[in-house]
Amino acid sequence: MKTSATSFIPGSLVLAFCLPVVATSPKTLAIPEKLQEAVGKVTVNATTCTVICGLGFKEETVCEVGPDGVRRKCKSQRLECLTNWLCGMLHFTLLIGKEFKLSCLSPDILEIGQGAFRFTWRLARGIISTDDEVFKPFRASSYFIKFQSIQEYDSGTYRCDVQLLKNLRLVKRLYFGLRVLPPNLVNLNFHQSLTEDQKLVDEGLEVNLDNYSRPQHPPWKKKVAIAVGIGVAGGVTGGVLVSIVLCGRLSVIHSSASLETLQALLPKGGMLRKPD
């Protein structure tokens, strides 16, 4: 009995494994006629978003495709797109009294209309930071802030949040780092401080800066350098002559003092005689 029971169990297992194979043998499925004639809409082409952050647009082409694979009734449509709502920070350095404007929307998105968005501005006055804890509300409800005559007090970090009014979805956050300097503090003319070769490079031309030679100084600088050199040379020469004269006088005085000392040491009536 034990032997028959043992042989029955493996036989049952083999039969159990074979049944699914027989039950799932491939069969030809009949597709209904309605499905064979079905037509679907397929996106056949799409452009990238017009902006890399914030709300933008993209173009899509949608066609009807049937069982034969032929495209029919193709239409192009312009759709909103959002790849990333966080747009980083833009830095600006300005002089006091200049007119300036901050704008957190691109012209193409304004085609929808300013009324479709909600704009919230916040300010971290006097510092450049993206820490949300240092920002305080700033009174502005438009997509831009305009400074008629900017002052040092206006420096800091401005944050603009853009939301869709229909669902209050945040679609853009942009920071503006603003530095305001007095006009007599620094010369902001970067191009003026460049050398001739560097100006050519700045204009997009190829220049080998390894063979760069120092620029020629203006004529008035050469004259000043010559005058300074002559003055220094004259001063040194005069100092040497004065030193020679003083040394000569000191030698004469020292010689006279030595003769007087020797004369005092000789007996009365004695005189010094020059050697033959």
Swiss-Prot record:
GO terms for cellular component: plasma membrane. Its main location: membrane. Keywords: Cell membrane, Disulfide bond, Glycoprotein, Immunoglobulin domain, Membrane, Signal, Transmembrane, Transmembrane helix. Disulfide bonds join 104-160. The chain crosses the membrane at residues 226-246. GO terms for biological process: sperm-egg recognition. This is Transmembrane protein 81. SUPFAM superfamilies: Immunoglobulin. It comes from the Eukaryota. CDD domains: Ig.
